[in-house]
């Protein structure tokens, strides 16, 4: 039996073990090999980690929600305005448990329990790297829509379980609206009006 639950900071070491099983030492969030760093992020309420554990209480899956911070792959460093977007990130499944629907269960748990994380979220954005097709398909399955692309945004990323080359890495930007109560008037520059309307219609 696989149980989905929120990670307690006491079990962070088990999460690091999962990262190493999935990526070795190639994971690009290098700080997440540091136990104290993750504990501080959890205790400071910057992240909430959702995990999947097996019958032996071993962590075999994980996704993290970065919240109420301008943080992550496309953040505006140094901005002072409060951000009401969350970023689902760091989705990973133990190699021995893949293709069993665990990743989708983790995302569904996160989406169904957003109020436990932050009641003020307006939406979720997720910028999967272009070479990780599975994560893109998973976002689409759960209602995220493409709203942009950062071409060659990162230097080349080498991950132990993907085909790697010397190309720089691009990011897709996907978005899921959560709270659509407020209405904003946006005045579009004529030069970009058609493409902006196209993107907006795509994400509903």
Label every model-predicted segment.
Residues 97, 101-109:
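Conserved acetyl-CoA pyrophosphate-binding loop and the N-cap/start of the following alpha-helix
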Residues 187-204:
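Short, cationic low-complexity segments
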Residues 89-100, 128-130:
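A short, internal acetyl-CoA/4′-phosphopantetheine-binding micro-motif in the GNAT/acyltransferase core
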Residues 12, 16-95:
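A conserved beta-strand-loop-helix scaffold within acyl/acetyltransferase catalytic domains
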Residues 1, 154-192:
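C-terminal "cap" of GNAT-fold acetyltransferases
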Residues 2-15:
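A short beta-loop-alpha structural element at the N-terminal edge
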Residues 114-130:
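Conserved GNAT acetyl-CoA-binding A-motif
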Residues 125-127, 140-163:
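Conserved catalytic-core motifs of GNAT/GCN5-like acyltransferases
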């Amino acid at each position: 039996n696989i149980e989905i639950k929120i990670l307690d900071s006491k079990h962070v070491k088990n999460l690091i073990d999962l990262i190493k099983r999935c990526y070795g030492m190639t994971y690009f969030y290098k700080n997440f090999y540091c136990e104290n760093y993750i504990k501080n992020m959890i205790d400071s309420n910057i992240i909430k980690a959702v995990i999947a554990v097996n019958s032996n209480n071993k962590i075999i899956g994980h996704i993290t929600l970065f919240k109420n911070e301008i943080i992550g792959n496309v953040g505006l460093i140094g901005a002072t305005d409060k951000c009401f977007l969350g970023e689902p990130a760091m989705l990973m499944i133990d190699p021995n448990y893949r293709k069993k629907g665990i990743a989708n269960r983790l995302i569904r748990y996160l989406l169904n329990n957003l109020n436990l994380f932050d009641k003020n979220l307006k939406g979720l954005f997720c910028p999967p790297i272009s070479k990780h097709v599975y994560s893109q398909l998973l976002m689409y399955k759960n209602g995220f829509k493409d709203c942009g692309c950062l071409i060659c945004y990162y230097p080349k990323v080498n991950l132990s379980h993907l085909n790697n080359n010397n190309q720089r890495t691009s990011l897709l930007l996907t978005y899921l609206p959560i709270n659509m109560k407020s209405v904003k008037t946006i005045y579009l520059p004529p030069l970009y009006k058609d493409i902006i309307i196209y993107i907006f219609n795509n994400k509903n």
